[in-house]
A protein has these predicted regions:
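Conserved, single-site charged/polar hotspot
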Residues: 1-334
Length: 334
């Protein structure tokens, strides 16, 4: 049923005091240890598959329910609890904790709702009976975020009748990119989408400078078989990108480093050790200083919904449904 609601749960939540007072929202929420941000979590599972421990726990839950004579009455039934990082937590509260680790209280409520729907959708997409471990979750949640999550709890994004894969990230390069460029997997609704307002956001452009010696040290640390010799200007060449910025600059699919081709992800995240925040970047060399300048645009993987773009759309009057329809084209809400 479209825009499904659990009225009793909503009433119970309305009568429950939020975990924090509004005054506490000025302090960044504490994040659980030994976890990763949502965007990294999604990327890892897109490339490596759903966490096996979570799948195993889901199978145990199903077996336990079957032994007690419980049937999975409805695949779309709203969960009462989410097992978040090993802790059984009331479902709305758990969802709000994940959202609060992804966006802060300054976000427009419609953008927060869009993020909440995207997160809930991903939890359904994983099909682990709402068991999730290793994911950043805030210890405290503001009234604003808790209320926004409550309003859309149970809604999710569907494609061909099934929960969609709904990655989010902080800030695009002015456009999002296709999933196959960064993740290596293709989804019909994760294609390039214009997000031009992101170009005006704080942190849009980042530049770092490395000497040839520093780059060589990083490359050798990443892979000792990489041979950086001869003219330094030929050491690093972007070999494939999507042209998000221009014909010469975009989200990078492959880079040639010392004759060895690696993915843009491995170059930015592993070789450069996350010194740049985006996978949309350009590399240039200056012989006079024997230095490499690496310029990146945006922040995050660039696939799916730009949270900065969503916030700008919300500020301009768009609803969460309109935001989701833009960043996941061809999908619907259920």
């Amino acid at each position: 049923v479209k825009y499904q609601r659990d009225k009793k749960a909503a009433e119970a939540l309305a009568n429950t005091a939020p975990e924090t007072t509004s005054e506490e929202t000025t302090v960044p929420p504490e994040i659980s240890k030994d976890t990763v941000p949502l965007s990294v979590f999604m990327r890892n599972e897109a490339v490596n598959g759903i966490d096996k421990d979570d799948l195993a726990r889901a199978a145990e839950d199903a077996a336990s329910a079957a032994s007690q004579g419980d049937n999975a009455e409805n695949a779309n039934a709203l969960p009462e609890y989410i097992v978040l990082n090993g802790v059984k937590t009331e479902a709305k509260k758990a969802l709000a904790k994940i959202v609060a680790a992804d966006v802060d209280d300054s976000y427009n409520s419609e953008a927060i709702k869009a993020d909440a729907v995207a997160v809930y959708t991903y939890l359904k997409y994983r099909n682990t009976n709402f068991n999730v471990s290793g994911l950043n979750a805030a210890e405290t949640v503001s009234d604003n975020i808790l209320n926004a999550v409550s309003e859309v709890f149970g809604e999710y994004v569907v494609y061909n009748g099934q929960p969609a894969f709904t990655p989010t990230f902080k800030l695009s390069a002015g456009k999002t990119t296709s999933a196959d460029v960064v993740f290596g997997n293709s989804f019909p609704y994760l294609k390039t989408v214009d997000s031009a307002s992101d170009k005006n956001a704080d942190g849009y452009k980042t530049e770092i400078t490395l000497t040839s010696g520093e780059l060589k040290e990083l490359a050798n640390k990443f892979d000792s078989s990489i041979n950086l010799s001869g003219s330094a200007k030929d050491w690093v060449k972007v070999t494939k990108h999507d042209g998000a910025i221009s014909t010469g600059v975009g989200y990078v699919e492959t880079v040639n480093v010392g004759g060895k081709e690696i993915s843009g992800y491995k170059f930015a995240c592993e070789l450069l050790e996350n010194k740049i925040p985006s996978y949309c970047f350009a590399v240039s060399y200056t012989s006079s200083g024997d230095t490499f300048k690496i310029t990146s645009y945006g922040s995050g993987f660039g696939v799916g919904m730009s949270l900065a773009g969503a916030n700008k759309m919300a500020a301009d009057g768009s609803t969460y449904a309109q935001i989701l329809a833009k960043y996941y084209p061809g999908t619907n809400l259920s």
